[in-house]
Amino acid sequence: MHVTGLNQKLHNEFYPWFPKGVDQFIEDYYASAANVLVLYGPPGTGKTSFLRHILLSQNINAMVTYDERILKDDEFFINYLTDDEHNALIVEDADVFLAPREDGDNDMMSKFLNVSDGLIKIMNKKMIFTTNISQLSKIDAALLRPGRCFACVEFRELTSQEAGAAALAAGLAPRDWHSQNTWSLAHLFQKPDEPVAKKFRMGFGS
């Protein structure tokens, strides 16, 4: 499977909100009985690159999608629960799929909850969502229940000091990181006067 994201070695300085470091967080997640992980925050903050690191560091073969037509197919979920090939289900840009059911427009959540319940009996199979949602109140509370959800991780822009530390770790050319208050990870690797690269999804769709 081809996985996109920043073509850079991942450094802990990219994600200062992991107090024990990125790799320790991933190890704790895969050692946990909880199977759901939610990565939320604005575009450009490194969610896809973090996913890429999870897959590569844990040697994971994932089913990855963002396509509602695929997700509405019950066989897609059955295959994930029963096959021995895939050990992670990743739903990218899952904003509309994560909305509270009481809002009335989300018929996918019941499927996700059923799959999560099924995974409790299957070790080493995980379900990861990425979303640009900025508030956890916009995600169905049942998905975030302790025991089901390992963590909801907010991805944010870096402060100027954090950006400088991340740039130093990555070996980037010196810049005035204090020229603006915050930096997205995407802007960190963007050359001056270069347009921000278009986002590419990881998964398969239409």
Sequence positions of predicted segments:
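Conserved nucleotide-sensing/catalytic segment adjacent to the nucleotide-binding pocket
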Residues: 74-123
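C-terminal alpha-helical "lid" subdomain
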Residues: 142, 148-206
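Active-site signature of alpha/beta-hydrolase-fold catalytic machinery across serine-
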Residues: 49-53, 57
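Walker A/P-loop nucleotide-binding motif
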Residues: 32-50
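N-terminal pre-Walker A segment at the start of P-loop NTPase domains
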Residues: 3-32
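A short hydrophobic beta-strand->loop->alpha-helix junction that borders the nucleotide-binding pocket
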Residues: 64-71, 96
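Post-Walker A helix-loop "phosphate-sensing" segment adjacent to the P-loop in P-loop NTPases
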Residues: 56-66
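Canonical AAA+ ATPase core
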Residues: 117-143, 150-152
